[in-house]
C-alpha cells in the first residue's frame, strides 16, 4: 500500500483521516498505524489495509441515520465501500478492480465482500479481496488485500466450455473461469459452481 504522497492522503481521507493524523510504525517500518480517538487504520507495505472503529462511534459513516430505507441504506454502504476501494487501489497503484461478490445481513449489521478482478477475470486467493462490515451507517471494520500482477507471457489452455459442461454432474450448474494461486503464481482455471439449494 502507499506509504507517502497524495495516494496516501486520498486513502487517509477515504477513512476520515487527514495527513496530520497521529501515526506510528510497527514491524521495522513495514506497517504504518494511523489512529484517532475512535478508530485505527493499519497500512502494511505488503498491501494489507485494515481499519477498525470502536463500538461507540465511527470515523466513517455511510449515511445519515435519520430517515432512510433499507434499500437506500445498502446503496449508501456500497457507495461508501466503493469510494474507499477506489482510493485504496489508486494508492496501491494496482491494475485491478473490485467486484461485489456477496452481501450478508444480520440485524443492523451488513457485510460486503468484494472479489478482485484482473482483466475482467476474478482472482481467487486464500482470503477475500475486500470485506467491509457496517453496523447501521457506521463502518466498523474494513480489510483490503491489494496486489499487483505482472503477466508472465505464458499461455495456458483452459478446458473448453462445451467439454467442461459435458463432464458436469447434476449438482454442478455453472462454469466460471478465474485466476487461482498455484505454485506461487496465479494461473487461469475453469471450475464449476454448485447450486446453493443442493
Cite the ranges covered by each PLM segment.
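Preferential activation on post-signal-peptide N-terminal prodomains/segments
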Residues: 1-79, 83, 87
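Short, non-transmembrane alpha-helical segments in secretory-pathway proteins
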Residues: 2-16, 67-107, 151-187
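Exposed beta-strand-loop-beta-strand "reactive/processing" segments of non-cytosolic proteins
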Residues: 8-47, 95-138, 144-147, 177-198
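A short, surface-exposed interaction/processing loop segment used at functional sites
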Residues: 53-69, 138-160
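Generic hydrophobic/packing signal
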Residues: 73-77, 122, 139
Amino acid at each position: 500500500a502507499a506509504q507517502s504522497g497524495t495516494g496516501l492522503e486520498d486513502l487517509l481521507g477515504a477513512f476520515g483521516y487527514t495527513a496530520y493524523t497521529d501515526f506510528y510504525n510497527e514491524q521495522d517500518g513495514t506497517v504504518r498505524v494511523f489512529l484517532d480517538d475512535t478508530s485505527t487504520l493499519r497500512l502494511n507495505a505488503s498491501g494489507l489495509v485494515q481499519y477498525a472503529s470502536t463500538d461507540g462511534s465511527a470515523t466513517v459513516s455511510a449515511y445519515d441515520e435519520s430517515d432512510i430505507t433499507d434499500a437506500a441504506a445498502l446503496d449508501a454502504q456500497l457507495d461508501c465501500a466503493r469510494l474507499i476501494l477506489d482510493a485504496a487501489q489508486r494508492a496501491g497503484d494496482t491494475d485491478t478492480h473490485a467486484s461485489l461478490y456477496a452481501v450478508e445481513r444480520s440485524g443492523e449489521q451488513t457485510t460486503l465482500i468484494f472479489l478482485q478482478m484482473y482483466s475482467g477475470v476474478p482472482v481467487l486467493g486464500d482470503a477475500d479481496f475486500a470485506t467491509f462490515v457496517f453496523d447501521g451507517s457506521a463502518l466498523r471494520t474494513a480489510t483490503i488485500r491489494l496486489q499487483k500482477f505482472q503477466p508472465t507471457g505464458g499461455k495456458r489452455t483452459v478446458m473448453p466450455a462445451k467439454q467442461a459442461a459435458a463432464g458436469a454432474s447434476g449438482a454442478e450448474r455453472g462454469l466460471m473461469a478465474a485466476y487461482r494461486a498455484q505454485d506461487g503464481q496465479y494461473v487461469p482455471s475453469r471450475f464449476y459452481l454448485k447450486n446453493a439449494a443442493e
